[in-house]
Amino acid sequence: MLGIIKTEFLKLKRFHVLLIGLIGMTLPAILSVFTQAVATPEVTTQNFDFFALFNSTIWNSATIFMPVIFTLIGGYLISREYTDNTLKNILTVPVSFQRLLFGKLLAMGILSVLFGFYSYTITLIVGVLSGISGLSAVVLCTGLLQMLGISAFTYIAVLPIIAFTIRKPGIFMGGVIVSFLFGYSAMFIKDVTMRSLYPILSGLTVMRFDTGTFMNTSEHGNLTLSMLSITVMLLLTITIVRLTNPPQAVFKRKKHKKTDILIRKRPKGR
């Protein structure tokens, strides 16, 4: 498994999709500052300090950018094996197709946390350059823990979408659209029970993120329900991957290749 993860990170160096992810994870902090600057006085945050900047960045990331970016890169990692016609070569190694998928998904999980740290760093830089006040050790630690934790939980929330859309070649972009709608819809869920169960928002509840500023509600989500929701997402992903088989086209190509070899080796009759 470690070998698969290491290989995936080596492959990522050659993929332009990683650059798309870095650009995408730069935008939440910039969007937070820009929104605060152009908004009317009635809707602006009165004391927009570093604490508010981190909260706004995390909210924008979890509901808009992370679901799309994680699904895009996660699906791309596996889709490339189909489009580059390399899957048939990989499957000759004594590694099952399901184990290969688990390795790729785990590599993307690690990458999602790294993206969270990258977004945290960008938020600090944007805040300092914008002259925002209120930077302290408590704010730094809280922002880091929440950013990393919510990155991981947001990835878990979209894992079933990734796992389902990689079952067949060429449909992972449909998963990107579904993930966007999945994250964007979270903004309109007000009921505390639904917020606790909705996978995108479950991670916010577990990390004790205050959604009051963004959802106009002071009620905290139910931690037990949120943990249950996250567990269901993991179990659902495991089930989908275990039920996923290699595309039949791979076996057909391998079979045809063996047949061609036998034909070429067959001696000519007199």
Give the role of each language-model region.
Residues 68-82, 87, 158-173, 231-246:
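Transmembrane alpha-helical segments in integral membrane proteins
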Residues 34-53, 176-257:
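Terminal transmembrane helical anchor/hairpin motif
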Residues 77-109:
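Helix-loop-helix units of permease transmembrane domains in multi-pass membrane transporters
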Residues 16-18, 96-98, 102, 139, ...:
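Membrane-helix interface segments
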Residues 26-69, 102-167:
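Secretory targeting signals
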Residues 97-121, 184-211, 260, 264-269:
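Hydrophobic alpha-helical transmembrane segments of integral membrane proteins
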Residues 20-26, 169-187:
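Pore- or pathway-lining transmembrane helices of multi-pass membrane proteins that form conduits
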Residues 1-25, 170, 253-256, 270:
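Aromatic- and glycine-rich beta-strand/loop motifs that create alpha-glucan
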